[in-house]
A protein has these predicted regions:
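Alpha-helical recognition segments enriched in aromatics with Gly/Pro capping
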Residues: 1-56, 151, 170-175, 179, ...
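Small-residue-rich helix-loop
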Residues: 62-160
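Alpha-helix N-cap/helix-initiation sites
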Residues: 21, 42, 62, 81-84, ...
C-alpha cells in the first residue's frame, strides 16, 4: 500500500472531518483536533484501505508508479517502460494496489509470444487462427494510435463479413495471453505494429 494511503486510512480510524474520506497529510495537519477523535473502538477494514489506496494510485504520476511496478515484473524488453506508462491510465483504473498493476502489465514487459493462460487457450481455435492470419496480412503500417486502429478494425470486420466477437478475444489472447486486458486497440497501440504482428505470428504459428 502507498504510504499516503496508509496514513489517510489510519487517520480516519479514530478521527473524522465531516464526510471527508480522502485527506492529504497537509489537510490532516490543518484540520486535526482532539474534539473530533472518536470514542468507539476502531475496526481495521482491508477493503476500505484498498479503496483508499486505489484513489492514491489513480492520482499518482505514471512515471513514478512505473518505478514501483518495475521491480515486481523484472522487465526484459527495452520498450517495457514506454509500453506500461502508455497503458498506465487504463491499468490503474481498476487496480487496488501497484501489485495488481504489475500482474496486469506482465504481457507488456517482455517481447515475443506471451504465455497463453489455460482459460485463454481455447480462444485460439482453428477458425480464430484463420481470422488472425487474415488480419495479420492487412494490418496498417505504424505509428499506431488507438483511435485509428478502432476505425481500421471496424472497416476490416465489415469487409470480411465478421463481427468483433470473431476477432476480439482471439486477438487479445494472441497479444496478451489472457482473456482480460485494457481495450484491444489500446493494447495494440502500446505494443506497436512490429511487436503485435510478431506475437500473432508466433502465437498462431503462422
Amino acid at each position: 500500500f502507498l504510504p499516503d494511503a496508509m496514513v489517510n486510512y489510519l487517520l480516519r480510524l479514530g478521527w473524522s472531518h465531516g464526510d471527508e474520506e480522502i485527506i492529504s497529510r497537509e489537510d490532516a495537519i490543518a484540520w486535526f483536533g482532539l474534539d473530533r477523535v472518536g470514542k468507539a473502538p476502531a475496526r481495521f477494514d482491508m477493503d476500505k484501505l484498498a479503496d483508499i489506496n486505489s484513489h492514491y494510485l489513480r492520482a499518482m504520476d505514471d512515471g513514478e508508479l512505473w518505478a514501483l511496478v518495475a521491480p515486481l515484473v523484472t522487465p526484459t524488453s527495452p520498450n517495457a517502460e514506454e509500453r506500461v506508462t502508455k497503458l498506465m491510465p487504463l491499468l490503474k483504473e481498476r487496480a487496488k494496489t501497484h501489485k495488481h498493476i504489475a500482474a496486469a502489465a506482465g504481457f507488456l514487459v517482455h517481447d515475443g509470444a506471451p504465455e497463453i493462460r489455460e482459460d485463454a487457450a481455447g480462444l485460439l481455435d482453428e477458425n480464430a487462427v484463420t481470422n488472425l492470419h487474415k488480419l495479420l496480412g492487412d494490418l496498417p503500417e505504424g505509428p499506431w494510435e488507438a483511435e485509428t486502429l478502432q476505425t481500421f478494425l471496424k472497416d476490416w470486420l465489415a469487409e470480411n463479413g465478421l463481427k468483433m466477437k470473431d476477432i476480439g478475444l482471439p486477438l487479445r489472447a494472441a497479444l496478451t495471453g489472457t482473456k482480460q486486458s485494457p481495450s484491444i486497440v489500446d493494447v495494440m497501440a502500446a505494443l506497436g505494429p512490429e511487436e503485435a504482428a510478431d506475437r500473432i505470428r508466433k502465437t498462431c504459428k503462422i
